[in-house]
Amino acid sequence: MNISIISVGKIKEKFLKAAIDEYSKRLSKYCKLNIIEVADEKTPDNASLKEENIIKEKEGNLILKHIKDNSFVIALDLKGKSITSEEFSDLIENCRLTGNSTIAFVIGGSLGLSQQVLSRANYKLSFSKMTFPHQLFRVMLLEQVYRAFRILCREPYHK
């Protein structure tokens, strides 16, 4: 199975890079992982709604360039569906069983995802109603993908 994580912005903190590297290494047993970072647009202080939408559109266009036609796209969105880790593993397994061997997870920047990206998504997923820094969220997503594969393989994992 091919898993892509397409996210806005670069990871700067060493501790987050270390966590991403660790989960990437762990996931190599289960899937081919591709992490793609697209440039984030600078948001001016007190940006208008119109300016925010333009920024999201620019970031969205960069994201869409990396999504393959055959990808099952899961957008990480506050308005998405909240599911358990077990349901998340079922979602990944259902993709595999229905011939979707490529899953693209999309993480937006600080303003979220553009409407074009949300429209392209096959599934909208929310981890929480809380807001997280998008750099930290990448680690959280990798952990949940790793947990999902451990669940699918009936391997022990800390609960």
Curated annotation (Swiss-Prot):
Gene3D superfamilies: 3.40.1280.10
Domain of life: Bacteria
Binding residues for S-adenosyl-L-methionine: 76, 108, 127-132
Pfam families: SPOUT_MTase (PF02590)
EC number per UniProt: 2.1.1.177
Major enzyme class: transferase
Subcellular location: Cytoplasm
InterPro entries linked: Alpha/beta_knot_MTases, RlmH-like, tRNA_m1G_MTases_N
GO molecular function: rRNA (pseudouridine-N3-)-methyltransferase activity
Gene Ontology cellular-component terms listed: cytoplasm
Catalytic activity: pseudouridine(1915) in 23S rRNA + S-adenosyl-L-methionine = N(3)-methylpseudouridine(1915) in 23S rRNA + S-adenosyl-L-homocysteine + H(+)
Keywords: Cytoplasm, Methyltransferase, rRNA processing, S-adenosyl-L-methionine, Transferase
Principal localisation: cytoplasm
PANTHER family linked to this entry: METHYLTRANSFERASE, RIBOSOMAL RNA LARGE SUBUNIT METHYLTRANSFERASE H
Similarity field: Belongs to the RNA methyltransferase RlmH family.
Function: Specifically methylates the pseudouridine at position 1915 (m3Psi1915) in 23S rRNA.
Assembly: Homodimer.
Name the record gives this protein: Ribosomal RNA large subunit methyltransferase H
